[in-house]
Amino acid sequence: MASKNTNIVSKTLVESYIRKQVKALKQSPAETIDTLTKQLLDKPKGSLEKYLLHITPEKLQDTQSGYYKLFHDILPKVNTDHLVTLGMNIGYNGIFTASKNSQTNSPESKSDALWAFMLSIDGINYEKKSAQYKAQISNAKKNGTRCFMLFIEKNAWKLLPLIKKEKDCAFFLFCPSSCLTEKFLDAVKLTKNLFISVAYNSNGNKEQILSTNIFNRLRSRKLPYGIHYYYSVSDLDNFKSGEIFKKLSKEKPLFSFFLSKKADSGKDTVTEEEKKAVYEIIIKERYWLKYPSIPFEIEKDYYYLLH
């Protein structure tokens, strides 16, 4: 009982600290990052810590830096409760718990202590498969996972009851704009542990028409959101020139996610060498951040954050 009470107190203190830092980031980004950087320098460097050290106070004071624009113009307009809840669930409930599990559990279970879990959802036949999805999420949680990346093409609203129930988890929902109805977005506004990523294009051959109005609707509700883009080898020149980062950043997403396109057969249309080339460009852009949206290559970053 004492241990449980200690955990509750510890979690409350961490949440209070995160809330304080989020508010400070909104009000004084450079000073807050300077303080956090000094704290990180005194700690062991995991993948996340090493990345955070790239966001230096100098970059936040440089008006030409994407980090300056992101922290001064975009982040302050996002609801604080969303940022705190997502930060708590990813950081304290997720990464900390997974790390603790990997240290205390048997060697066989260490490989299962994932900080994030990816799952493709069949929105059309969701009712028939919901028990399967819930079991997968439950099993991942037993191993310490508290961050879930859900990919769905239809009927994203069906996932809301599950997401709301798992209050200690963070959910990144990757879906097309067609899922984002006014009613759904109103419900998302009340779902603090949910982060929406809007598909900029489709994974298949058929190109979708994306209305920029959807981003206005997300911003009007002060929701945190990202954009995901399915890339092919024909996009390589746009990666090299930076045009693709510039294009996506115009919609003011916190994050830009990139996924390689798949053929109808499910086979990847991008070779491993081409992915590596794209990833190297993304790492460079993320370090310097010319445009105000932090880019990630889903497959590569997911792998390197786990290893």
Question: Locations of the language-model features?
Answer:
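Short amphipathic alpha-helical segments and helix-helix/interface helices
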Residues: 134-138, 160-164, 184-188, 211-216, ...
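Charged, low-complexity, helix/coiled-coil-prone segments
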Residues: 14-18, 25-34, 73-85, 129-133, ...
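Core AdoMet radical
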Residues: 116-131, 140-156, 166-183, 187-211, ...
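Radical SAM enzyme [4Fe-4S]-AdoMet core and its adjacent flexible, acidic
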Residues: 2-42, 143, 169, 195-199, ...
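A short linear-motif detector with a strong N-terminal bias
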Residues: 95-100, 151-153, 272
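N-terminal [4Fe-4S]-dependent radical SAM core
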Residues: 45-120, 142
